[in-house]
């Protein structure tokens, strides 16, 4: 698999090597009491997911997490922990993403917005179906972390 392609400048014809790099994303496990917030996605792939999204240019991961939580759930969050980073090239059918997952606390009632048609509270041990991406595994890792303070598997 080629990790770069050549593109030509339309003005001068100079060939530029353009690298094909993974896209950085964040996911936010938002805790409200003993439940977590999940969104039902408006866009493909359809299903339930942890709120999150793509990092904008010039934005930190924490800023992205806070922005995405607000856009998709209407909630103001307090980031309390970085859980892990997930980098399986096949984790997202839209392309290779690398996601940093945060745990956050919030108060209030989630309301779907932006590309989330719904935002609802669920017990992390009773997830809706279908779950998108690798988010079922992320929630399993979250439960292990909540129980033991660590995650035993490597990514």
Predicted regions mapped to residue ranges:
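Generic preference for hydrophobic
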Residues: 28, 79-82
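Short acidic capping loops at alpha-helix termini that bridge into adjacent secondary structure
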Residues: 35, 77-80
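Acidic, metal-coordinating catalytic segment for phosphate/diphosphate chemistry
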Residues: 1-27
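Residue-level preference for beta-strand/loop junctions
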Residues: 22, 46, 94-98
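Short beta-strand element of the conserved SAM-dependent methyltransferase core
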Residues: 7, 28, 102-106
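Unchanged
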Residues: 55-78, 86-142, 153-155
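Conserved Nudix-box catalytic region and its N-terminal flanking loop in Nudix hydrolases
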Residues: 26, 31-72
């Amino acid at each position: 698999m080629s990790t770069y392609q050549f593109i030509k400048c339309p003005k001068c014809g100079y060939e530029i090597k353009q690298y094909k790099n993974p896209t950085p994303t964040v996911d936010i496990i938002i805790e409200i009491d003993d439940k977590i917030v999940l969104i039902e996605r408006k866009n493909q792939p359809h299903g339930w997911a942890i709120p999150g999204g793509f990092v904008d240019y010039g934005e930190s991961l924490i800023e992205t997490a806070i922005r995405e939580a607000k856009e998709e759930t209407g909630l103001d969050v307090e980031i309390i922990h970085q859980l892990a980073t997930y980098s399986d090239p096949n984790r997202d059918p839209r392309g290779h993403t690398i996601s940093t997952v945060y745990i956050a606390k919030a108060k209030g009632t989630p309301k779907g917005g932006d590309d989330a048609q719904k935002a609802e509270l669920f017990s992390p041990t009773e997830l809706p179906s279908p779950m998108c991406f690798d988010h079922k595994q992320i929630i399993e890792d979250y439960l292990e972390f909540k129980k033991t303070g660590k995650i035993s598997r490597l990514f």
